Design a protein with these regions (language model features):
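Short glycine-rich substrate-engagement loop in P-loop NTPases that contacts/grips substrate
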Residues: 53-85
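Conserved P-loop NTPase "ATPase switch" module shared by AAA+ and STAND
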Residues: 81-100
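Interdomain motor-coupling "hinge/lid" segment immediately C-terminal to the ATP-binding subdomain
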Residues: 129-180
Length: 180
């Protein structure tokens, strides 16, 4: 399923040194789907965690360890180097851990070449509540909206109809009763 946001994900990937990427959006708008598709298509290796299912990682980030110590333990838990160019680290449901959200600043400053992307339901609500811990300026945020009509037609492989709608719109003419 093609989504317009995919091009933004490609632009983020093409930057040699980039901030962690956070996808914001309402529940069930396709955040996990599009991130999974992007990760599978664009990276050789994907390390994916869902914080709703990884209480061990949530607890790790609630400790008083230094950021370096937490990161080293995270790599051990996941059995992955995480910093290789061909690896992307996908954290789903990141809203579960406000401390891990705050730790994104560490990833940005200390591991700028690391490919890290995160998403979560109700993330925007959670961010508004905890602005003091959010790493302002250290995370790139992109909004994902529910599928629009153009994306819907593309998903249904209705490219001819889409082109005709655009043609009618640009010429300011009616489509006709049969197609409307």
């Amino acid at each position: 399923m093609k989504r317009k946001i995919y091009n933004d994900l490609i632009k983020w990937k093409e930057q040699t040194s980039h901030k962690p990427l956070m996808i914001l959006g309402v529940r069930q708008c396709g955040k996990t789907y599009i991130i999974n598709e992007f990760c599978q298509n664009e990276y050789k290796n994907v390390v994916q965690i869902n914080l709703l299912q990884r209480d061990d990682i949530v607890k790790l980030y609630e400790t008083d360890l230094t950021s370096d110590e937490k990161f080293n333990r995270l790599k051990l838990i996941l059995n992955s180097e995480l910093e290789a160019e061909d690896i992307i680290f996908f954290i789903d449901e990141i809203q579960v851990s406000e401390r891990l959200i705050a730790e994104l600043k560490y990833f940005c400053e200390c591991h700028p070449k690391m490919n890290i992307i995160c998403a979560g339901s109700l993330l925007g609500v959670k961010l508004n509540r905890s602005r003091s811990t959010f790493p302002v300026g250290k995370v790139k945020m992109i909004n994902l909206y529910p599928m629009d009509f153009e994306e819907f037609l593309i998903a249904l492989d209705q490219n001819m109809l889409l082109d005709y709608i655009k043609e009618c719109y640009n010429a300011n003419k009616q489509m006709g009763e049969v197609l409307h």
